[in-house]
C-alpha cells in the first residue's frame, strides 16, 4: 500500500483514501477485442474459484480485474462490462472470506473500486459480500479488520438498497464489539448519504439501531452511536427529538455534554486555570458598569444555595443546545474568562506565574460559521469541540457578566423590496463562484415556494433555472439542488408556466442526454414526472410536438430518445382513452418521426422508441389516429400498419376515420403459432412448450421413487399454470420486452455452446436485478423450466451458479408463482449440488435453498425434507444440504408457525444422525440446536428421550453457547 498508518498496537490500518489511491495502481493489460476481454475474465474466474491455488496468483488476479475494467471499458459498453463482473460474484465471496490478509485486502480494494464505479448497478455484489465483510471486521488482525471495515463503508455509501440495511440490522445483536462499532459507523453514512425516499421507509429502524449503539456496553461503540445521533439530529431533527426522550437520564446527559469531563479537567487544571477575579479585573478595565462586589460573589457563586430549589434533571425537556464549557472575552484587553456553567460550582484559584498564564497565548479566533449553522452541526457535540469553535451560547446571566462589547450596527435592509431580493438571489445563482452559487440556490428554494410572485419574477426565475440546468460546469451537487428547485417551482406555479414549459423540456431532455450517472438521471426523470403530473396532458402533448418540430432546438439523438420516452409516458399514463389527438401538431410530429427514421445514422437508435410512441397514439384514439395519417403516402401507411400489427394491435389501422373516437385496440397474436393457447408468444416458444411437455421426464435425475413422484406432481401443476398464463392480454409497451426475453430463453434452451448459453443467462439475470423483468405472467413458467433443465443437465458450473441466483431472485420477487413447483425446485437445486467440486457452486446452492425455504409453503418444504432424510440408505450430500435448509428455516421463521411442523420433522432429523458421514451428524446437531432455540427445550424434550445421553449433553452445550445469538432480528 502506498499509504499506511501503523498504530501503537501493531499492524496496519487502512482508510478509504488508501483504497482510492491504489484503485488504478495496477499493471496495464493489452486487450485486443471484446472476445479477448471475455477470455481474460474467464481465466480470472478459473483461478479465483480454486481456493487451493497459490495465493500470489489469486492476489494478482484480483488486481487484474481492476486492470481489465480500466483498460477494457473502451472496447465494450457498460452493460457488457457489468455482465462480466457479475460472473465473478462467487469469486468475490471466496476472496472476502479468505483467511490470508493479502487476499482479503486486494479483494476489498477491488470490490470497493467496482461498487464506487458502477454504483447500484452492481448491488448484487455489494449485498452478497457484505455479510462476509462484516464477519472479517471481528478478526484480531488489524490489516484484515480495517480492510473489511473500509469495504463495508464503500458498500453502504454506493449500494443504497433495503437489503443492505436488513443485513446490517442483523449485526446489532452481535457478540463482537467491533462489529457493533462498525455498524454504528455505517449508520452515520446511511443517515448522511442515503436518499430521503429510502430513509423514510426505515427511519424507525435506524432510530432503534442508533439507540442500541448509544446504550452499548462498549465505550467506543457508544461514542460512535453519539456521532450517529448527531448526524440524525442534523438530517432528521424530529426523529432525533423523539429518540432523545426515549433514552435514560444518563444517556441524555452524555448527548448534552459529550466529552465535558475531559474539557472540565483541562480548563480547571492547576497549570491552565487563572483566578476568575484576577481575570475579570484585568479584562474589565474601563468598564465601570460591572460591580466589583458582584464579580467577587460570582467568583465563588452567583447563586444563593439556600434559595436554590434542588431538582433532578428533567427527562422531558431537551435543551436546544449544549452550553460551552468556556466563555471567551473579546474585550480590548484580550482576556478570556473560563468558568463552568454548573450552578453552585467553584473555580479553582491556584496562583500561577506569568510564564504559565494563558494571557500570553495567542487569541483564538471566532468560528467564521454563523451561529445557526454551528448549532445545527454540533448541537449534541462535546464541550471541548464547542471551545475549539469559540461558540457563544449565553444565558441572560452570562450576558450580564461579560464585558460590554461595542458592535457596529447592522444595516437594515429596509430599502430592499421583494423584487430587489429576488434579483439579488438570481444574481448569486449566476455567479462564477461555486460557493456563492450554492448559497444563491439555497436562498432560491424558499423564494420559488412563494405563491405571490409577480409574472416578471416568475419569468426571471424560470430563465435562471434553465441557464443553471444547461451549465455543463456545474457539479453533481449543484445540479441536484437545481433539480430540487425545479420540482418545487413547477408544483407551485404550474398554472403560470405554460409558455415556459417548452424551453424547460428542451433543457431537461438535453441534460438527460449528456448525463451518465444513474442517480442524476433518476433525479431528472423525477423532475419530468413532476411536469407530467402538474401540467395539462393536452397542453404537454402539443408542446412536445412543437418542440420536436422546432427548427431552432435541434436535439442530439439521445435527447430525441428522452423526448420520445416522455411522449410515450404522457400518452400511456396521463392521457385519457378516447381523448382527441387529431391535431396539426401531432401530424407534423409524425412526419418528423419519419424524417428521423429515414436518417440511417439515427434510425437504429430511434426506431424502437418511435414505434412505442406510435402504438401509444393508436391506443389513445383509433379513429383520430386513422384520420391523422389519412394524408400520408402509401409507403408510410404501410409501415405504420406493419408496426401496429407486429406489436399485437388488432387489424392495424382502421379503414375509416369516422367513429365515436373512443375505440380501443385489442391485443392479438403476434404471429400464427402451432399451439392454440399461445396467443402472445413467438412460434419457437409454442413448439418449445410441446417439446418440454414430452421431455420433462428427462429432467428427473433422482433415483428415489418418492422424489420422482413429487417432481411429476409439481411438473404437472407447472404445465397447467403455464398454459393458463399464455393467454394474457398485454399492453403494447410490454410486447417488445416479451420478445426480447423470449429470444434469450430460446438461447438458454437450445444453445449447445456453454459461453453463448452463459451470455443469455447473464442478460436475464441483469434484467431481473435491474427490475426490467416485469413480464412474469408470460415468461415465468418458461424461464423456470429452462432453469430446471440447466440445473439438471448442464456441465458448466458457471451456468448452474447463475441459474441458482436467478431462481433465488424469482422466488424473492414472485414467490406465489412458485408455490405449485416447490418440490420440483428443491429437487433441481439439490441436483445441481451433487457431484460438484466447485466451492462457489456450493455457496450458491446454500443461498438458493435458504431463499426457497423461507419464501415457499412450509408444508411443502417439510414434506420434501422428510422424503430425503428417511431414505435407506441415506444420501449424505442431499441430506446435509436439506439439514442446512431446515436449520435456516428454524432460524428465520417465527416460532408460532414452526410449532405446527416440529413434531413431523424432528424424528427424521434424529434418524439422519445414524449416517456414517461426520458432516451429516454435525449438521444434525446444529439443526437440533436451532430447533431448541426457536421452540424451546420443553417442546423438544419428548424427542430427546430417544437420544443417547452423550448426544443430549452435546446439544445442551451448543444451546447454551448459541442462545444469546438466536434472538429475532430487528
Curated annotation (Swiss-Prot):
<dbReference type="InterPro" id="IPR024395">
    <property type="entry name" value="CLASP_N_dom"/>
</dbReference>
<dbReference type="GO" id="GO:0008017">
    <property type="term" value="F:microtubule binding"/>
</dbReference>
<feature type="compositionally biased region" description="Polar residues">
    <location>
        <begin position="344"/>
        <end position="355"/>
    </location>
</feature>
<keyword id="KW-0963">Cytoplasm</keyword>
<dbReference type="GO" id="GO:0090307">
    <property type="term" value="P:mitotic spindle assembly"/>
</dbReference>
<dbReference type="GO" id="GO:0005876">
    <property type="term" value="C:spindle microtubule"/>
</dbReference>
<feature type="repeat" description="HEAT">
    <location>
        <begin position="905"/>
        <end position="943"/>
    </location>
</feature>
<dbReference type="GO" id="GO:0072686">
    <property type="term" value="C:mitotic spindle"/>
</dbReference>
<feature type="region of interest" description="Disordered">
    <location>
        <begin position="651"/>
        <end position="675"/>
    </location>
</feature>
<dbReference type="InterPro" id="IPR016024">
    <property type="entry name" value="ARM-type_fold"/>
</dbReference>
<keyword id="KW-0206">Cytoskeleton</keyword>
<dbReference type="Pfam" id="PF12348">
    <property type="entry name" value="CLASP_N"/>
</dbReference>
<comment type="similarity">
    <text>Belongs to the CLASP family.</text>
</comment>
<dbReference type="GO" id="GO:0005815">
    <property type="term" value="C:microtubule organizing center"/>
</dbReference>
<dbReference type="GO" id="GO:0040001">
    <property type="term" value="P:establishment of mitotic spindle localization"/>
</dbReference>
<dbReference type="InterPro" id="IPR011989">
    <property type="entry name" value="ARM-like"/>
</dbReference>
<dbReference type="GO" id="GO:0045180">
    <property type="term" value="C:basal cortex"/>
</dbReference>
<feature type="region of interest" description="Disordered">
    <location>
        <begin position="314"/>
        <end position="377"/>
    </location>
</feature>
<dbReference type="InterPro" id="IPR034085">
    <property type="entry name" value="TOG"/>
</dbReference>
<protein>
    <recommendedName>
        <fullName>Protein CLASP-3</fullName>
    </recommendedName>
</protein>
<dbReference type="GO" id="GO:0000776">
    <property type="term" value="C:kinetochore"/>
</dbReference>
<comment type="function">
    <text>Microtubule plus-end tracking protein that promotes the stabilization of dynamic microtubules.</text>
</comment>
<keyword id="KW-0493">Microtubule</keyword>
<dbReference type="GO" id="GO:0005881">
    <property type="term" value="C:cytoplasmic microtubule"/>
</dbReference>
Amino acid at each position: 500500500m502506498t499509504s499506511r498508518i501503523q498504530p501503537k498496537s501493531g499492524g496496519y490500518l487502512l482508510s478509504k483514501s488508501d483504497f482510492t489511491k491504489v484503485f488504478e495502481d495496477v499493471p496495464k493489460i493489452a486487450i485486443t477485442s471484446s472476445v479477448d476481454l471475455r477470455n481474460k475474465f474467464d481465466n480470472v474466474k478459473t483461478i479465483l474459484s480454486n481456493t487451493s491455488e497459490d495465493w500470489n496468483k489469486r492476489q494478482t488476479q484480483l488486481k487484474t480485474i481492476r486492470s481489465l475494467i480500466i483498460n477494457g471499458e473502451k472496447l465494450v459498453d457498460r452493460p457488457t462490462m457489468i455482465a462480466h463482473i457479475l460472473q465473478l460474484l462467487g469469486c468475490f465471496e471466496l476472496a472476502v472470506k479468505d483467511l490470508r490478509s493479502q487476499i482479503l485486502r486486494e479483494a476489498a480494494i477491488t470490490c470497493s473500486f467496482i461498487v464506487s464505479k458502477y454504483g447500484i448497478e452492481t448491488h448484487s455484489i455489494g449485498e452478497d459480500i457484505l455479510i462476509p465483510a462484516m464477519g472479517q471486521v471481528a478478526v484480531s488482525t488489524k490489516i484484515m479488520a480495517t480492510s473489511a471495515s473500509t469495504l463495508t463503508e464503500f458498500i453502504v455509501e454506493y449500494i443504497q438498497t433495503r437489503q443492505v440495511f436488513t443485513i446490517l440490522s442483523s449485526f446489532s445483536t452481535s457478540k463482537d464489539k467491533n462489529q457493533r462499532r462498525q455498524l454504528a459507523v455505517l449508520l452515520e453514512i446511511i443517515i448522511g448519504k442515503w436518499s430521503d425516499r429510502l430513509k423514510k421507509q426505515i427511519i424507525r429502524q435506524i432510530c432503534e439501531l442508533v439507540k442500541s449503539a448509544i446504550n452499548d456496553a462498549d465505550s467506543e461503540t457508544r461514542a460512535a452511536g453519539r456521532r450517529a445521533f448527531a448526524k440524525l439530529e442534523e438530517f432528521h431533527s424530529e426523529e432525533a427529538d423523539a429518540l432523545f426522550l426515549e433514552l435514560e437520564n444518563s444517556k441524555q446527559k452524555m448527548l448534552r455534554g459529550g466529552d465535558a469531563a475531559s474539557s472540565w479537567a483541562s480548563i480547571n487544571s492547576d497549570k491552565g486555570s487563572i483566578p476568575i477575579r484576577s481575570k475579570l479585573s484585568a479584562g474589565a478595565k474601563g468598564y465601570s458598569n460591572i460591580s466589583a462586589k458582584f464579580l467577587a460573589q460570582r467568583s465563588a457563586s452567583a447563586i444563593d444555595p439556600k434559595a436554590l430549589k434542588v431538582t433532578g434533571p428533567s427527562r422531558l425537556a431537551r435543551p436546544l443546545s449544549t452550553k460551552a464549557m468556556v466563555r471567551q472575552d473579546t474585550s480590548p484587553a484580550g482576556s478570556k474568562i473560563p468558568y463552568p456553567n454548573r450552578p453552585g460550582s467553584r473555580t479553582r484559584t491556584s496562583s500561577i506565574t506569568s510564564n504559565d498564564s494563558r494571557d500570553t497565548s495567542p487569541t483564538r479566533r471566532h468560528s467564521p460559521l454563523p451561529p445557526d449553522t454551528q448549532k445545527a452541526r454540533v448541537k449534541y457535540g462535546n464541550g471541548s469541540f464547542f471551545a475549539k469553535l469559540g461558540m457563544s451560547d449565553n444565558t441572560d446571566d452570562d450576558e450580564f457578566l461579560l464585558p460590554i462589547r461595542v458592535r457596529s450596527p447592522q444595516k437594515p435592509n429596509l430599502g430592499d423590496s421583494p423584487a430587489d431580493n429576488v434579483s439579488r438571489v438570481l444574481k448569486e445563482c449566476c455567479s462564477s463562484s461555486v460557493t456563492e452559487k450554492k448559497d444563491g440556490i439555497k436562498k432560491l428554494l424558499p423564494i420559488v415556494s412563494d405563491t405571490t410572485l409577480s409574472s416578471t419574477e416568475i419569468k426571471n426565475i424560470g430563465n435562471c433555472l434553465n441557464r443553471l440546468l444547461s451549465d455543463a460546469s456545474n457539479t453533481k451537487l449543484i445540479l441536484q439542488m437545481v433539480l430540487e428547485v425545479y420540482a418545487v417551482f413547477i408544483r407551485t406555479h404550474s398554472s403560470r408556466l405554460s409558455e415556459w414549459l417548452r424551453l424547460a423540456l428542451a433543457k431537461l431532455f438535453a441534460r438527460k442526454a449528456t448525463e451518465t450517472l444513474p442517480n442524476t438521471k433518476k433525479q431528472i426523470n423525477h423532475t419530468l414526472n413532476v411536469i407530467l403530473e402538474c401540467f395539462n396532458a393536452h397542453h404537454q402533448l402539443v408542446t412536445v410536438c412543437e418542440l420536436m418540430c422546432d427548427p431552432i432546438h435541434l436535439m442530439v439523438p439521445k435527447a430525441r430518445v428522452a423526448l420520445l420516452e416522455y411522449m410515450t409516458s404522457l400518452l400511456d399514463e396521463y392521457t385519457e382513452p378516447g381523448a382527441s389527438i387529431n391535431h396539426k401538431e401531432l401530424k407534423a410530429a409524425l412526419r418528423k418521426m419519419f424524417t428521423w427514421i429515414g436518417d440511417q445514422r439515427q434510425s437504429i437508435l430511434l426506431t424502437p422508441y418511435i414505434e412505442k410512441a406510435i402504438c401509444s397514439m393508436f391506443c389513445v384514439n383509433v379513429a383520430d389516429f386513422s384520420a391523422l395519417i389519412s394524408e400520408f403516402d402509401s409507403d408510410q401507411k404501410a409501415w405504420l400498419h406493419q408496426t401496429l400489427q407486429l406489436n399485437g394491435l388488432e387489424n392495424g389501422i382502421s379503414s375509416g376515420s369516422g367513429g365515436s373516437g373512443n375505440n380501443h385496440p385489442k391485443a392479438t397474436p403476434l404471429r400464427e403459432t402451432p399451439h392454440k393457447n399461445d396467443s402472445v408468444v413467438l412460434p419457437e416458444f409454442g413448439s418449445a412448450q410441446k417439446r418440454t411437455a414430452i421431455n420433462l421426464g428427462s429432467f428427473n435425475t433422482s433415483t428415489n421413487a418418492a422424489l420422482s413422484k413429487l417432481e411429476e406432481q409439481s411438473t404437472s401443476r407447472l404445465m397447467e399454470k403455464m398454459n393458463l398464463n399464455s393467454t394474457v392480454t398485454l399492453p403494447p409497451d410490454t410486447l417488445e420486452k416479451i420478445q426480447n426475453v423470449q429470444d434469450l430463453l430460446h438461447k438458454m434452451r437450445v444453445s449447445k455452446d456453454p459461453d453463448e448459453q452463459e451470455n443469455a443467462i447473464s442478460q436475464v439475470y441483469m434484467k431481473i436485478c435491474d427490475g426490467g423483468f416485469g413480464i412474469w405472467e408470460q415468461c415465468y413458467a418458461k424461464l423456470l423450466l429452462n432453469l430446471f433443465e440447466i440445473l439438471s443437465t448442464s456441465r458448466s458450473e458457471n451456468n448452474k451458479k447463475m441459474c441458482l441466483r436467478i431462481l433465488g431472485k424469482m422466488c424473492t420477487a414472485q414467490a406465489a408463482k412458485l408455490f405449485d413447483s416447490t418440490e420440483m425446485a428443491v429437487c433441481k437445486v439439490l441436483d445441481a449440488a451433487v457431484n460438484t467440486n466447485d466451492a462457489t457452486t456450493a455457496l450458491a446452492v446454500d443461498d438458493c435453498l435458504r431463499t426457497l425455504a423461507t419464501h415457499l409453503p412450509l408444508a411443502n418444504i417439510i414434506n420434501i425434507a422428510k422424503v430425503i432424510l428417511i431414505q435407506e440408505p441415506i444420501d449424505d450430500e442431499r441430506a446435509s444440504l436439506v439439514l442446512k435448509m431446515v436449520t435456516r428455516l428454524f432460524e428465520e421463521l417465527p416460532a408460532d408457525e414452526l410449532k405446527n411442523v416440529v413434531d413431523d420433522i424432528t424424528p427424521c432429523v434424529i434418524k439422519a444422525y445414524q449416517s456414517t458421514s461426520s458432516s451429516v451428524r454435525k449438521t444434525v446437531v446444529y439443526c437440533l440446536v436451532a430447533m431448541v432455540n426457536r421452540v424451546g427445550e420443553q417442546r423438544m424434550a419428548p424427542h430427546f428421550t430417544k437420544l443417547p445421553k452423550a448426544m443430549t449433553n452435546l446439544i445442551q452445550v451448543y444451546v447454551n453457547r448459541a442462545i444469546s445469538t438466536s434472538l429475532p432480528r430487528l
